[in-house]
Amino acid sequence: MFTSSRTPQQISRRTLLLASIGSASLLTACADEGPAPTAKETSLPAKVADYGVDPAQLVMTVYKDASCGCCGGWVAHAEDNGFTITTEHPEALHEVWERHDIALDMQSCHLSLTSDGDVFVGHVPARFVLKYLADPPKGARGLSVPAMPVGTPGMEQDDEFDPYKVMLLTDDEPRVFADVRKASQQRT
């Protein structure tokens, strides 16, 4: 028969100490996720790879209001199409618009910024972002879908769809980059 010279209180303290050390080690190991990704670490979806865009160009920071749900829908759409997104919620979103010189009539609910400084305002479908990044027009700064048209990525409402224009942002007047008449024109 096994007998111990230790009291139950001593065993409890030792068990507690060992459990604490083990828990701390486990938490430390789980917390180390490594460096933040700079591009998708997995291969791009074939439909995205066909655009010939360098995966490093698919890293964006999205500036949006913390309470905006439709922006989350657009972020999910972008991530499904190979983009790596970091989201920021500035207290003064209007300062982001001013810093990037986005005219009031070209604004929407969020602004996405690449590391190269290209801006994508609002619910711009990934298809047009990829097309732009593959061959940016001379003098262009980015694209905008002003306002929040129903049926754009993140603004889906059943089968409803409002035609809209994707605007090319330049140092001069914006001009039409794409005229989207049907929801199917948004697909990558």
Would you name each region that the model predicts?
Residues 85-96, 106:
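Thiol-based oxidoreductase modules, predominantly thioredoxin-like and allied folds used
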Residues 53-73:
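Local sequence-structure signature of Cys/Sec-based thiol-disulfide redox active-site neighborhoods
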Residues 61, 72, 76, 80, ...:
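Solvent-exposed, polar/charged alpha-helical surfaces in well-ordered, non-transmembrane soluble domains
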Residues 59-60, 83-84, 116-119:
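Short active-site oxyanion
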Residues 1-26:
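N-terminal secretory signal peptides
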Residues 31-33:
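Bacterial signal peptide processing site
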Residues 99, 105-187:
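Thiol/selenol-based redox catalytic cores and closely related redox-interacting motifs
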Residues 36-52:
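Low-complexity, Pro/Thr/Ser/Glu-rich flexible segments characteristic
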